[in-house]
């Protein structure tokens, strides 16, 4: 039934209050290609203004909040915590079931100087099998300008049985930009085995502004994760054990102390920000990066426990 609704939506043009919306292009018998765009800049009055919010079915974007910020920050000053910036909040809505096999979906994000963009989703994404060519794919490409901030934390991606899904996240940060990025993966729906899912995370940061001539961006994080029933020993004690949910939380920028995770009195997070050693506890670990930030990785038997471990971080014990 979901596939029938999918065909109806993608076969025509969805009408909006101001005229037709963009329609996703077909790439195969059932596969679709779609690219949505979010661009936020600082308005003359100091607020965060969405200068482009372009949906592309099945990716629907809705602005759900805005705040003026506690102060107006010069774009070159990194001392201001990111949550004090003028903020725009956008939610992602899946207009159809899926993604299905062969779907190629993407989201382009651009954050200007002196503003913050918060991106959330209204529900989990369930990757499903289908008749399209190759795996389904969702790509997020983001650029954050000096003094800008991106808080990207959608709901989990669920790899349903028989699915083959690829997640790609590519972020480019200016020297004084700030990033909070959370990714959560759930292996299968309730009572079923997992599908195959691969996650690639690349985060680069510009060299210091005083370097002349400018050098190539510095890699801040490279992370590849491959999961699925074809992986030998996936549920063994050396890998996931009984865990069915896993994820990571990356915080990077000139003032990570002002991040929401640090304000929760997470002792390991504060240690990481001050250059202390990594911290580890049951199902969760914190790794200081060779740049301004840290990475929390966790696994759990369910999505609720996973979220708590990512947000709170490990216990104060260090290794």
Curated annotation (Swiss-Prot):
Instruction: State one Pfam family annotation.
Output: UreD
Which pairs of positions does the record mark as disulfide bonds?
Answer: none
| Top-level taxonomic group | Bacteria
Chain segments carrying region Disordered: 254-273
Is Iron given among the entry's keywords?
no
One molecular function GO term is:
nickel cation binding
This protein's UniProt keywords: Chaperone, Cytoplasm, Nickel insertion
Q: Which residues fall in a compositionally biased region of kind Basic and acidic residues?
A: 262-273
UniProt entry tagged with the keyword Cytoplasm = yes
Q: What is its main location?
A: cytoplasm
Family in the record:
Belongs to the UreD family.
Q: How does it assemble?
A: UreD, UreF and UreG form a complex that acts as a GTP-hydrolysis-dependent molecular chaperone, activating the urease apoprotein by helping to assemble the nickel containing metallocenter of UreC. The UreE protein probably delivers the nickel.
HAMAP family given for it? UreD
Q: What's its job?
A: Required for maturation of urease via the functional incorporation of the urease nickel metallocenter.
Specify the protein name.
Answer: Urease accessory protein UreD
Q: Which organism is it from?
A: Frankia casuarinae (strain DSM 45818 / CECT 9043 / HFP020203 / CcI3)
Q: Which gene encodes it?
A: ureD
């Amino acid at each position: 039934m979901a596939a029938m609704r999918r065909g109806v939506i993608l076969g025509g043009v969805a009408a909006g209050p101001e005229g037709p919306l963009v329609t996703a292009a077909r790439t195969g018998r059932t596969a679709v290609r779609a690219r949505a765009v979010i661009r936020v800049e600082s308005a003359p009055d100091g607020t965060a203004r969405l200068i482009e919010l372009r949906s592309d079915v099945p990716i629907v974007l809705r602005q759900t909040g805005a705040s003026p910020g506690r102060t107006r920050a010069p774009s070159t000053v990194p001392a201001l915590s990111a949550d004090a910036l003028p903020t725009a909040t956008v939610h992602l809505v899946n207009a159809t079931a899926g993604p299905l096999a062969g779907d190629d979906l993407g989201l382009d994000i651009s954050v200007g100087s002196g503003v913050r963009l918060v991106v959330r989703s209204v529900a989990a994404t369930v990757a499903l099998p289908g008749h399209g060519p190759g795996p389904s794919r969702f790509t997020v490409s983001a650029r954050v300008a000096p003094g800008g901030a991106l808080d990207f934390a959608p709901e989990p991606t669920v790899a349903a049985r028989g699915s083959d899904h690829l997640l790609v996240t590519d972020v480019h940060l200016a020297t004084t930009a700030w990033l909070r990025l959370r990714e959560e993966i759930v292996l299968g729906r309730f009572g079923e085995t997992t599908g195959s899912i691969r996650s690639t995370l690349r985060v680069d940061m510009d060299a210091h502004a005083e370097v002349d001539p400018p050098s190539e961006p510095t890699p801040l994080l490279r992370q590849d994760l491959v999961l699925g029933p074809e992986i030998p020993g996936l549920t063994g004690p050396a890998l996931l054990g009984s865990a069915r949910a896993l994820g990571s939380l990356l915080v990077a920028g000139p003032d990570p102390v002002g991040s929401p995770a640090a304000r929760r009195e997470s002792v390991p997070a504060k240690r990481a920000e001050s250059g202390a050693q990594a911290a580890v506890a049951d199902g969760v670990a914190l790794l200081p990066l060779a740049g301004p930030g840290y990475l929390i990785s966790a696994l759990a038997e369910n999505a609720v426990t996973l979220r708590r471990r990512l947000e709170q971080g490990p216990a104060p014990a260090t290794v």
